[in-house]
Amino acid sequence: MASFRRFRLLSPLKPCVTFGRMLYTRIDKDGLTMLAGHLAYVSLLSLVPLITVIFALFAAFPMFAEISIKLKAFIFANFIPATGDIIQNYLEQFVANSNRMTVVGTCGLIVTALLLIYSVDSVLNIIWRSKIQRSLVFSFAVYWMVLTLGPILVGASMVISSYLLSLHWLAHARVDSMIDEILRVFPLLISWVSFWLLYSVVPTVRVPARDALIGALVAALLFELGKKGFAMYITLFPSYQLIYGVLAVIPILFLWVYWSWCIVLLGAEITVTLGEYRAERHHAKSVITQSPEM
């Protein structure tokens, strides 16, 4: 009787255990931590060129001048925990120095920025085990569109948000408190949508929208928790500041970028494993239904 009850208690957990095993096997086989390390290295190499290109695009549109300042503050406050102000100061100095570059140097910056997008594309297709390759021209067009249209769309959305917030009917206390609550979860929503687009669009194979949404939600939640946990770790255990002093910002930034890519790739692995788990269950059911006939 006791064993029967134990079986009834464990049976709902069996799918979760099976899925967990499949996920762990896939993560181990793909070498998730090594892929995250590769992307972290490329990210640090491409960070300044990417930011330079993005804010150069904002500078080309005078209507985005004020929005670019708000966007900088929003990114560094919500996506880089702790030491965000120090990193922001350094990056702004690097961007200011890059404005004196020649045409050849500017082209080099753009190529380096595109290198990050190419690396993300390659790693995600490794995880999806996709053998379909896009043409070089098509890939370049997609990368360039992401690099140019992405910041412009973000800027346009912030312009619209600023306009809506300036309307008089939104000054009501109840509406104002509701807006505060929405703004509080806004970084989570942005992360969720960004990860969903990443998992849906980048792979060269078809990705079920539901799987991409679930994987993106897990990644977004882990990203928010990781951001708070990382900030707490840096505050409570300031070992990097004690050892490296002024240079502590370098290992801290690398550690955060590496951790962020681990989360992004984990969301991708979850998305892929959901499809594989569903296919395996469907196969098992078909075998069971066919066995009496045999």
Curated annotation (Swiss-Prot):
Any one of the GO CC terms: plasma membrane
A Pfam family matched in the record: Virul_fac_BrkB
InterPro entries xref list: UPF0761_bac (IPR023679), Virul_fac_BrkB (IPR017039)
Subcellular location(s) of the protein: Cell inner membrane
Superkingdom to which the source organism belongs: Bacteria
Keywords per UniProt: Cell inner membrane, Cell membrane, Membrane, Transmembrane, Transmembrane helix
Sequence intervals crossing the membrane: 44-64, 67-87, 108-128, 136-156, 185-205, 212-232, 246-266
Residues making up the signal peptide according to the UniProt record: none
Membrane topology recorded in Swiss-Prot or TrEMBL: Multi-pass membrane protein
S-S bonds: none
Classification via NCBIfam families: PRK01637.1 (NF002457), yihY_not_rbn (TIGR00765)
Record-stated family: Belongs to the UPF0761 family.
UniProt-recorded name of the protein: UPF0761 membrane protein YPTS_0028
Species per Swiss-Prot/TrEMBL record: Yersinia pseudotuberculosis serotype IB (strain PB1/+)
Lineage: Bacteria, Pseudomonadati, Pseudomonadota, Gammaproteobacteria, Enterobacterales
